[in-house]
Amino acid sequence: MALSPNYGWAEPDNSSLVKNGAQDIRALGDAIDTSVWNVGYGQAGKNKIINGDFGIWQRGTSFQLNLASSVALADRWQYLCDDGANIKTFSQQTFTPGTAPVAGYEGTYFMRIASATASATETYSLFTQYIENVRTFAGQTITISFWAKAAANTTMPSVAIRQNFGSGGSTAVDTSVTTNIAVTTSWQRFSYSVAVPSVSGKTIGANSYLRIGLFNPTQA
């Protein structure tokens, strides 16, 4: 048996005997089946975040949040807070060529979040993406990675996930991923792994989801 050049699948040699043909074909079929399964829905290696490079903004490229509610930003992304006194502006920014922080990948865009006023009463400030179906990654370990920097050194309170079981479903489950993230004035990559709780025994209703949340500094 030989190995395919890209995926390393076992495949018949040019000199394989006819009597080994069925065995060789089955080995190749099993290898392909395993590879496709591993990158399929909810399987290891599948990135479920959509528009993670902030390249798509169908509703515009700059938004302001001045109410204690939420605002839709780049496609699939949303921002939530509980105090509209802390006015925030969200905008698509373009990297100067050669300055993107990811080695080997010259990204084009990033998102900027700017606070215009301070708030003494804001208790949460959350940058998030909702992934349809609470079954997504249930019972598996996932990795959440992102790049961030700030105008001045600051601390992000936490990264967390929420499993919402939909209308009429079980009570939502919140799981902390990490806390007290030191963000500096230089781009840094942050990467954290977390075990997503099983949904065994839960009741799942309509419009369930898994939420990935990056909690931002409040009162600033």
Features from the language model and the residues they span:
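Extracellular and organelle-lumenal recognition/adhesion modules and their flexible linkers in secreted
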Residues: 32-220
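Extracellular "spike/adhesin" assembly and maturation modules
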Residues: 1-37
